Swiss-Prot record:
The gene is SAUR54. Belongs to the ARG7 family. Provide a mechanistic link between auxin and plasma membrane H(+)-ATPases (PM H(+)-ATPases, e.g. AHA1 and AHA2), and triggers PM H(+)-ATPases activity by promoting phosphorylation of their C-terminal autoinhibitory domain as a result of PP2C-D subfamily of type 2C phosphatases inhibition, thus leading to the acidification of the apoplast and the facilitation of solutes and water uptake to drive cell expansion. Triggers plant growth probably by promoting cell elongation. Regulates branch angles and bending. The keyword Cell membrane applies. This is Protein SMALL AUXIN UP-REGULATED RNA 54. It is found in: Cell membrane. The lineage of its organism: Eukaryota, Viridiplantae, Streptophyta, Embryophyta, Tracheophyta.
Length: 117
């Protein structure tokens, strides 16, 4: 049991560090937006499967397609709060996460790992 708790503590610490690095990106992100993906009118891009959504991450605005289940995860909700504070949600840039891509990849990888209790 102690090993599991220690593992959870380590994962929690890692997630906190990742979120801290994400928030440090700040206003370094570009405010330009070029959406080069195919769209069907005002709907989602055609390459986004049902049950997924798109976010843009980092200074180069790398596009990620994520499962909607991430929206309920507290660590992802913190990123959304940072995005709202940084950019608001009323802009033409798509959902942009103010986070370095390396830190974001690390967070997503940890979120995809099964949780053992």
């Amino acid at each position: 049991m102690a090993i599991i708790n220690r593992s959870k503590l380590t994962q929690t610490t890692m997630i906190k560090q990742i979120l801290k690095r994400c928030s440090s990106l700040g206003k370094k992100q570009s405010s330009e937006y070029n959406d080069t993906h195919e769209h069907d009118g005002d709907s989602l891009p055609l390459d986004v499967p049902k049950g997924h959504f798109v976010v843009y991450v980092g200074g180069n605005r790398v596009r990620y397609v994520l499962p909607i289940s991430f929206l309920t995860r507290p660590e992802f909700q913190l990123l959304l709060q940072q995005a709202e504070e940084e950019f608001g949600f009323d802009h033409n840039m798509g959902l942009t996460i103010p986070c370095e891509e390396v830190a974001f990849k690390s967070l997503i990888t940890s979120m995809l790992q099964p949780t053992y209790i």
